[in-house]
Amino acid sequence: MNEKIRNFESNQMKKDIPPLHPGDVVEISLWIIEGNKKRFQIFEGMIIAIKNRGLNSAFTVRKISSGEGVERVFQIHSPVIKEINIKKIGVVRRAKLYYLRNLKGKSARIKTRLHVN
């Protein structure tokens, strides 16, 4: 029984996911369905947390929009995600960057290395 579940989950997992790390600035293309129209929308921000749980793996992305912090949790293997692009690689020493919620302006920046696809 356990082997059947493991095989099913491995078949459902996406294979083309780039390696994600906290502090990375990513651009996520999402499929949005409105009525009978299907389009994609881009959400760009910094990864502040990753939860590795096999098929249920998720990551939290934070961005500042109109002066307000917006956080969104994405399932890594979700069919809603069209693609994930890494814009910058962050250099951090923490697994969870929740402290960024309390920082504003230049103090909320982290060191980055430029990433070229």
From Swiss-Prot:
SUPFAM superfamilies: Translation proteins SH3-like domain. Signal peptide: none annotated. Keywords: Ribonucleoprotein, Ribosomal protein. It comes from the Bacteria. GO terms for cellular component: cytosolic large ribosomal subunit. One of its GO terms (molecular function) is structural constituent of ribosome. GO terms for biological process: translation. Belongs to the bacterial ribosomal protein bL19 family. This protein is located at the 30S-50S ribosomal subunit interface and may play a role in the structure and function of the aminoacyl-tRNA binding site. This is Large ribosomal subunit protein bL19. It comes from Blochmanniella floridana.
